[in-house]
Amino acid sequence: AERCDELRGYMLKPLDFDPAKRYPVLLTQYSGPGSQQVAEGWGPDWEDALVTHGYIVVCVDPRGTGYRGEEFKKLTYGNLGRLEVEDQISTARYMARQSYVDPARIGIYGWSYGGFMALGCAFRGEGLFKMAIAVAPVTSWRYYDSIYTENFNGLPDDYPKGYDDNSPVNLAHLFRDDSTRLLIVHGTADDNVHFQNTMEMARALNKLGKQYDMMVYPDQNHSMMPDDMIHVREKMLRYTLENL
């Protein structure tokens, strides 16, 4: 990261990768407290298919994630979404400096906490990201369930800034819709991240006249399974190919 923290990540390159060429990059991330995506394992998803289309896919576990010790995990306590967004933006800037990357074609994607992060990065990125996809995103920690939120963000009376300063509904004014294409995806029957999150995000963006795209899945839950699992992934793949 730019402040010299060592972060763990992985990179997937096209099979015919040529360092003399410039490639678009998609950051895929979850970034939630105590989580881990960068590990020795194999679990391909839609974004990995982008590699066969000539994209580089990068994943970095930011500060606050797991398996780096208690101190590292607790860095984000009471302020969810600040350090993690800083680290993902730092990752994007690092990739933009690489000779084999097209700096004008960097995107970010995330689901759930990752969707919260994708919005935060799109809004705070100052046009760095050409595209962002946020699926089932938390848009205000005041809307999410207390057993999770209070565990990692403290009580709202004790940490009001942690609840509000990094919540995407309060950052819509920062969104540069002239340089970043944004897709928000949500199921109306999501009992984890309630659909209210996306509706309030839409209200904030609409009020400011911001342009974005949305895909709504009627009666679908947080995972979009089983009915729309394939549809949502094809939607995201096509959206990326068209906008990144």
Where are the regions that the model predicts?
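Serine-hydrolase catalytic core recognition
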Residues: 1-244
